């Protein structure tokens, strides 16, 4: 409880700022996808690497971006496998070691990923999402009613002895990485037929929902409502379903994203016939490349909790600001060039996004340097 309090509560303003930061990032990426579609009338790629290739017309830049995308999804997958090892070890009987459970979990996901079609994997993920929302609602609504001191919970100042700035510095990268959604923006615009209004509404509401859930959960947890509820059998079952569905859904999404990137990077080794067949099903090499490295890291560190938090912090402090802060600005400026003409002056949104990304990366560098000096 203390850890949660230290990290989450003192930053309602930070959460609001992060929401608008992510919103601007998503809207700019949607503009890039729509402009790319309108200018070339081509199919906008779902792979973030191919999407960047098409926008920047540079294979080298696309490979760098693809590598960054692979790294961030690998970190998320490693965190998910590690947490699954701990969570399912507590749920399953027999007192199994978390490393064994984590290895079994990763193996099952890998087998499902290359035996099921993409549509089949999406159906599994959709079921997990439905279970996630239903279990979350069954936990949250009674927990909100069980908060003993609503005003005291809202005004609670936290217990971190290092103060507000240190708390926010530690929290922002973790929260930023957990609120990431921008990698699916090209797919969203495609599903909405590249309609600007529909895409803007979907991104605005879709990016707000995780923040609202996050704030509500923090409020219920800090107020003691969740602890009071999960002591009962029904509450404990709902919490187990919530944890399991979140891990399964997020890990499947990570594997699908990784496999798509690896399939794009290794596409030259396949013949045309094989290429046409893997559009609906991921190849075994792509799945192995996606699952094996994160699983190896998790097993080598014996499902360390510090590793998981460290990976999320690294993603939120360095990779996420680059991929979804600096990159959207660069893509927008590139796609706005007209037949050799110079790009227009950066918009206010682009300036805010780029400044925020530089600020996130800069504060992390300053923090790391100060830690080394100390």
Give the location of each predicted region.
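Extracellular loop-to-transmembrane helix junctions
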Residues: 3-39
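Transmembrane helix-loop boundary segments of multi-pass membrane transporters
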Residues: 4-7, 57, 86-96, 119-128, ...
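Hydrophobic transmembrane alpha-helices that form the core helical bundles
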Residues: 24-94, 240-268, 325
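Transmembrane alpha-helical segments of multi-pass small-molecule transport proteins
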Residues: 65-70, 90-117, 130, 178, ...
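Helix-loop-helix junctions that connect adjacent transmembrane segments
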Residues: 92-232
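Hydrophobic alpha-helical segments of multi-pass membrane transport proteins
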Residues: 132-142, 247-258, 286-297, 301, ...
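A generic transmembrane alpha-helix motif of multi-pass inner-membrane proteins
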Residues: 304-374
């Amino acid at each position: 409880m203390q850890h949660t309090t230290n990290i989450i509560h003192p930053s309602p303003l930070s959460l609001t700022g992060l929401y608008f930061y992510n919103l601007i990032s998503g809207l700019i990426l949607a503009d890039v996808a729509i402009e790319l579609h309108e200018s070339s009338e081509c199919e906008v790629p779902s792979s973030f690497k191919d999407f960047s290739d098409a926008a920047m017309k540079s294979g080298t830049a696309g490979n760098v971006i693809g590598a960054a995308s692979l790294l961030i999804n690998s970190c998320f997958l490693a965190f998910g496998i590690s947490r699954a090892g701990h969570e399912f070890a507590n749920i399953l009987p027999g007192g199994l070691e978390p490393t064994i459970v984590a290895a079994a979990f990763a193996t099952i996901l890998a087998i499902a990923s290359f035996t099921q079609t993409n549509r089949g994997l999406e159906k599994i993920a959709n079921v997990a999402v439905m279970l996630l929302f239903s279990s979350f609602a069954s936990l949250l609504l009674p927990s909100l009613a069980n908060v003993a001191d609503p005003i005291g919970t809202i005004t609670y100042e936290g217990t971190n002895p290092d103060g507000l700035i240190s708390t926010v510095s530690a929290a922002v990268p973790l929260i930023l990485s957990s609120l990431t959604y921008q990698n699916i923006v090209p797919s969203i615009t495609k599903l909405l037929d590249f309609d600007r209004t529909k895409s803007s509404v979907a991104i605005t509401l879709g990016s707000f929902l995780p923040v609202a859930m996050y704030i509500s959960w923090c409020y219920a947890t800090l107020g003691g409502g969740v602890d009071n509820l999960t002591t009962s059998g029904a509450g404990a079952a709902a919490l187990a379903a919530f944890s399991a569905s979140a891990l399964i859904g997020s890990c499947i999404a990570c594997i699908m994203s990784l496999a798509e990137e690896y399939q794009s990077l290794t596409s030259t080794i396949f013949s045309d016939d094989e290429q046409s067949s893997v559009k609906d099903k991921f190849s075994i090499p792509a799945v192995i490349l996606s699952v094996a490295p994160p699983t190896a890291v998790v097993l080598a560190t014996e499902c360390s909790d510090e590793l998981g938090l460290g990976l999320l912090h690294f993603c939120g402090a360095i990779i996420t600001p680059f991929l979804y802060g600096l990159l959207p600005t660069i893509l927008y400026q590139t796609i706005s060039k007209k037949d050799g003409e110079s790009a227009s002056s950066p918009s206010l949104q682009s300036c805010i996004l780029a400044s925020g990304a530089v600020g996130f990366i800069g504060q992390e560098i300053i923090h790391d340097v100060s830690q080394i000096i100390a």
